C-alpha cells in the first residue's frame, strides 16, 4: 500500500471530496486526520473511515489553522483542503463585503494554510488545493469565482518553489456529484446529472471518488509539483 506509515490531513474532510479522499488514503494504508466545522459530521466521518484524529474549527480562521498544526503530536505527510465555498453574483448585484469575505476564505486562508502546515510536513510530502475550472468557463455571475480559481494555480506554483521539497499542486474540479452540489441545486440536481451524462465526453458524471483517486496519485508520485490537474470529464470543452 502506497501510503503506509504516512499521515494525511483532510481539511473539509467530513463529506464530499474530502471524505472520499480520506477513504482512498486509508485504503492505501495512511492514517487520516479530519478537519471540519461540524463536530457531528466529523464524528460520523471519523467512524466511517477510522480516522486517527479530528479537529473542529473554521479553516478560514488563521489562528485556528496555526494552533491545529502546532498542536499535532507528530510530523505529517500530506494536506488536502477543499474548504471554502464560491460566491456567485453578477456585477450589478455584487455585495463587496461578502466578496471580500470570500476572497479571505479562498485566497488568504490558503496562504495561511501553507504557512502553518509546511513546517510540519515531511520532505516530499504535499499540499493539495482543490479548486475549480471557472476561470476557463466565464459566465454571468461567476466573476469572483473565476478570479479565485485563476489565482489558486499561480499561488500554488510559487509555493512549490518556495516550500520545496514539499510539493504543492492544485486539483481543478468541474461539477462533482457531492452533497454540496445536491444542496446547491436542490430539485434541479437530476436534470443537471442527465445533462452532463448527455454532453460530457466521458458520458457520466464525475464523482468524488474520481477526485480522490487523483489526490492519492499526487501524494504518491514525487515527480509532480507546481501544477494544476483537471478532473472535469471534459466539461471545459463543452457548454454543459
Describe each region flagged by the PLM.
Residues 48-63:
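Rossmann-fold cofactor-recognition segment
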Residues 102-103, 112, 124-164, 175-176:
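Catalytic loop of short-chain dehydrogenase/reductase
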Residues 153, 162-177, 224-231:
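Conserved Rossmann-fold SDR core element
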Residues 14-15:
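Conserved glycine-rich cofactor-binding loop
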Residues 204-231, 236:
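C-terminal substrate-recognition "lid" of short-chain dehydrogenase/reductases
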Residues 90-91, 98-103, 192, 196:
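Substrate-binding pocket helix/loop in short-chain dehydrogenase/reductase
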Residues 176-199, 238-240:
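A glycine/serine/threonine-rich, flexible loop-to-helix segment
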Amino acid at each position: 500500500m502506497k501510503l503506509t506509515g504516512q499521515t494525511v490531513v483532510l481539511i473539509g474532510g467530513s463529506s464530499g471530496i474530502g471524505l472520499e479522499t480520506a477513504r482512498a488514503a486509508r485504503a492505501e494504508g495512511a492514517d487520516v486526520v479530519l478537519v471540519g466545522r461540524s463536530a457531528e459530521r466529523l464524528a460520523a466521518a471519523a467512524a466511517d473511515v477510522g480516522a486517527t484524529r479530528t479537529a473542529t474549527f473554521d479553516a478560514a480562521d488563521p489562528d485556528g489553522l496555526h494552533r491545529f498544526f502546532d498542536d499535532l503530536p507528530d510530523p505529517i505527510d500530506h494536506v488536502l483542503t477543499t474548504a471554502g465555498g464560491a460566491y456567485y453574483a453578477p456585477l450589478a448585484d455584487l455585495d463587496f463585503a461578502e466578496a471580500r469575505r470570500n476572497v479571505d476564505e479562498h485566497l488568504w486562508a490558503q496562504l495561511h494554510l501553507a504557512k502553518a502546515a509546511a513546517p510540519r510536513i515531511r520532505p516530499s510530502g504535499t499540499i493539495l488545493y482543490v479548486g475549480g475550472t471557472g476561470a476557463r468557463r466565464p459566465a454571468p455571475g461567476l466573476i469572483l469565482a473565476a478570479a479565485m480559481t485563476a489565482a489558486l494555480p499561480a499561488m500554488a506554483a510559487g509555493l512549490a518553489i518556495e516550500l520545496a521539497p514539499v510539493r504543492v499542486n492544485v486539483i481543478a474540479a468541474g461539477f462533482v456529484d457531492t452533497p454540496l452540489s445536491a444542496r446547491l441545486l436542490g430539485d434541479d440536481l437530476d436534470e443537471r446529472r442527465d445533462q452532463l451524462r448527455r454532453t460530457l465526453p466521458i458520458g457520466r458524471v464525475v464523482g468524488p471518488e474520481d477526485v480522490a483517486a487523483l489526490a492519492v496519485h499526487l501524494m504518491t508520485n514525487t515527480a509532480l509539483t507546481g501544477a494544476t490537474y483537471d478532473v472535469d470529464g471534459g466539461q471545459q470543452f463543452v457548454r454543459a
